[in-house]
Amino acid sequence: MNRIMSLFAATLLGLLVGGAELLAQSGFEVKGVVNDAMGPVIGATVLETGTTNGASTGLDGDFILKVSSADAMVEVSCIGYATQTFKASELPSVITLAEDAMFLDDVVVIGYGSQKKKEVTGSVASVKAEDFNAGVKTSPVGLLQGKVAGLNIIRTTSDPTSTGFNVQIRGFSTLDKGAGTSPLYIVDGVPVSNIDNISPDEIASMDVLKDGSAAAIYGTRGTNGVIIITTKRGDNFSDAAQTRVEYSGYASLSMRNGDLGMATPEEFVNLETLSGGKVKPTIISDENGNYVLTDWMDELTRDVAVTHSHNVAIVGSSSKFNYRAAVAYKNAEGIAKNNNREEVIAKIAASQKALQGWLELQYDLSYMHYRNDYFCGDFKQAAILNPTTPIYDASQENGYYMPQGTGISNPVENMNQRESYQDGNYFRGSVKATVNIKPVEGLKVSGFAAFEEGDNHNFWYNKTINTDKDGSGKAGRGSDFNFSKLFELTADYSRTFGKHHFAAVAGFSYQNFLYDNSSIFNKGFPTEDMKYYQIGNGDAEKTYLTASSSRNSNTLAAGFGRVNYNYAEKYLVSASIRREGSSRFGVNNKWGWFPAVSFGWRITGEEFMEGKDWANELKLRAGFGVTGNNLGSDLRSVAMLSNGGTFWYNGSYVYTYGVSQNVNPDLRWEKKLEYNLGLDYAFLDNRIYGSLDLYYRQTRDLLWDYEVPTPPYQYPTLLANAGQMDSYGIELAISGVAVKRGDWTWTTTPTISFNRNVITKLSDPSKGFNYKQTTSGGVGENGIMNTNTQILIEGQSVGAFYGYKFLAIKDGNWYFKTPAGGVVDTSTAAEAYRQVIGNAQPLFTYGWNNTIRWKNVDASLFFRGVYGNDVLNLTRWAYGPRESAADNVFMKDITKKKTVYSNKALFTDYYLEDGSYIKLDNVTVGYTFNFKENSLVDNLRIYLTGQNLLTITKYSGQDPEVNTTSVWDAGIDYCDFYPTVANVQFGLNISFK
């Protein structure tokens, strides 16, 4: 956590905790100045212990506070400093705060509990709300982008109706598409399926469990890592009732800032000149030779898209009850026309003490309603459609021009003549009851019950009058329902005996999931008004009416335990184990063990480090843990039957069924064994601090669909465990107070991570599977090409591009190098000459956050990027130059001196481009106002933020930030795209007493 943002957070905290009761008090007045080694500390919190009565220091570090009596205890704190406590009558006039190395007393959530940061032995990164990314976020994971070394978050789209992010911790750990690479999300103790229903303004912290020793306590769901989200709650219990109101909101303007690389209308009509006579465009003109220039992208997009968001919270506390109730509203326009998302999120969190402290209760309830209006045009068609094609044609019944001979429909017509939207609701609730067993000091027993429920409803309609005849007059609707229930019982015990501290937790967990969906389609409606409202009134007697439904469920049950021990906060050890069963696995392998152990040694606590002022903190960590990967869907281990069509029998059609999946009673979870070695450090009076981690992973029993003989099998493929994959990496996070002079402070925080993986075994001959390689990364564009571009092969990593090694173009002929060093051309190139020609995985990823503060002004600049990866520019390959251009063309390979015709016959590294980039992802400037003690306003901050303002890259496509987290097609920039945008946002945060 950087120090300046910590000061800003402390300023907010100090202003928020000031109580309205302050004016009515006639107690004891304390005043003074708070300094550190460099001078006044701005934004330190001065708080009467046990209350919300407080003040914050001003520009000169000064404060005045009226407390209840001379005997009251007063805490002086600021994030990044050690807290000091004084009796009011003994509070000095000048208080000097000492910086707290890496905020060692900060609490880190580790799953089924929490620890002080200095006691953590696993690889865990904690990000507090004050350090989140600013700006418009379609998903809470965007708050973490670039903040945590080893956490790879890819922004895949600017469409507000999509989450827009793919998340991966420490690279690939599976080859199973169904299981995916996303981490497990825990929200306030509940494992959830969706975090997009959380208002970013209501998140207090996000803790990332990266290594196996930290994640093993989550068993079969811990392989991809865990992100624990803690939402905001009411203030601490206080004797005097306190209430405050908070508001945060912003308005944002978005504009296109990406270019796909296709010819503009002006370039298209001049292609013959620009290409040196090699490319002749087809100009669509009337009988008089007149033609129009149509910028199809402009026709489908807004000049400016507007988003506004508002969050109101009421926070209260008393001696036995506290609460936080919040309502958030957001309306986000997409840069595409007719594209919008609207959502309302409500949440209440409450805590209660009862039975003289024996019983503690926590209640959480949240609800979201949303509506997505989807874009029904097609940006790929807009990009490749001939720019001299008119939009309208008065001779057509619906007034739109029908493109001829291109296999492309009119994208403006589709946008205006079609509609598609989704709306839905989401509920999550939980209650936790904790009984403090007072006869046994440090022992408490908790019961936790939670539910999660979501329903989504989809509607779409294509109008009857449509030049795209195949899509005319059709409608559909579908619904899906998801429900899960969770029950947990835990016992916690914590005691300190002299220099020995012992903490343990043991528990049982049961979670059940239910999924239900249905859909129906029809066409041929009597009027346009019926569509999906009266879908049964379509042409049901003919062949188009289609209905389907499904219902599945699965269950997880587990017992778990963990023991933490430390001696004198120097020697640390943690051990955990989970025994878990999943109904998704085969009957012979439903249960498994997931152990973990980790150690820590705080070197700076040793006697030989006394007097070594250059080192404020040195802690070595070492850990080992086993995690699993639950199957991504139900019923994968049992035999399945599917509809095989119909045949005529005895005067009617009869449905047939056939085997579509083999039974596998031995199907089990993938198992990951992970070793981690880490160092937490702070040097030079805590001016430099951070962490270094090295890890090695072994993933065993990889899942794969293997080809099997029929008979004895009834279906030609079998999902089984046979493969192996290893990965390793280095993660470095550094925070440094680069400048601290007078009112100026500059904190810089770079992070960098290196990750490699290699498939060590794709199959197992002893089990009847003898695979060494298989191709993936399939691409196909309107019949132009249809091939696989990647390979999964033993000895290579995921994302290996597989094709022909480009050598040269001579007299229009393409030449390639063979693996043996020979040369072939297009006519003689054979499958045997294909080889690994690149990789979609970057050599390293990085982020760099900078925060500058001067008095009440704060500014931050955040950069992030990747280096060393290849991107397949499919648009360049499929729609590059050709002798006769009936459709639009990609311009990179067109010059007057040398125009290269696209080689659509073969995949070659000519079409792989350097995907490295650095982005100026976020720039924020803010100002925090000071208010007098008796002001109604506690806090007011205004800010201006710019997002995605600059990208430095060699890539010729719209955006080099393509998906690199997919097992099967990482690094492929498909022609289907949504325009990238830059955002400018104005916002404010205000709270009232």
Residue ranges and their predicted role:
Residues 1-348, 353-354, 359-362, 368, ...:
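Short, small/polar-rich motifs associated with maturation and membrane association
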Residues 46, 76, 185, 495, ...:
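Short aromatic-centered micro-motifs
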Residues 132, 182, 188, 305-308, ...:
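Extracellular/periplasmic, surface-exposed regions of secreted and cell-surface proteins
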Residues 184-187, 572-581, 818-841, 902:
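Catalytic-site beta-strand/loop segments enriched in glycine and acidic/polar residues
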Residues 244-292, 519, 720, 737-840, ...:
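Conserved small-residue
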Residues 261-263, 462-463, 521-525, 765-766, ...:
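Short Gly/aromatic-enriched secondary-structure transition segments
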Residues 839-871:
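Glycine-rich, aromatic-lined ligand/substrate-binding cores of catalytic
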Residues 859-920:
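C-terminal beta-barrel architecture of Gram-negative outer-membrane proteins
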